[in-house]
Amino acid sequence: MIASLRLGLALALLPLPAVAQRSDALAVERAALTMRPGAHRWADDPTLPGPVSIVVSVPMQMAFVYRGDVLIGATTVSTGKPGKTTPIGEYAILQKRPFHRSNLYNNAPMPFMQRLTWDGVAMHAGNLPGFPASHGCIRIPTAFARALFAATALGGQVAVVNDVIAFPAYRPADPVPRLEAEVAMLAGRDDRVSSGGRRGEPR
């Protein structure tokens, strides 16, 4: 009897970490729904499995941070203003510097800089007016930038999307890679190369 009670108790306790993780993720999601410019929420648990990845929603002016598939942080952002828009796409963190100055824009300070491209796009601490205002970078609050800088690794995945993320507590699926071919490089009806490698006769 005692043994069966102990077994039942042990089984009941097994899912608690997963329940707690999902509960924390939902709390971050709820906070994100009412954030004002400059607001953020960080609830990382370094014991969670999986790498840290980031999804930036340009229309929402929000970023969501995941460890594995669990939402651990959300923040307001300021992306690129008209004419200097932040490019949509999948990126890897190429460089990290706790303090950096822009070599493109008047030596502007870029604390907790995490570079996404070699031509001027990065995540860093900066001013958040509530609308796209940067020269292409993704500005985030200083406290959030510090925590994010400590959590990420070189090569970490960052997705900049032009979508509204309805349920950020559940990490969006990675986009299916799109294969594109250069039409001029494809074999066409005017190709005259035979299987033997010699120019064939026209049909």
What is the predicted role of each segment?
Residues 2-113, 118-138, 142-203:
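N-terminal pre-domains immediately preceding structured catalytic cores
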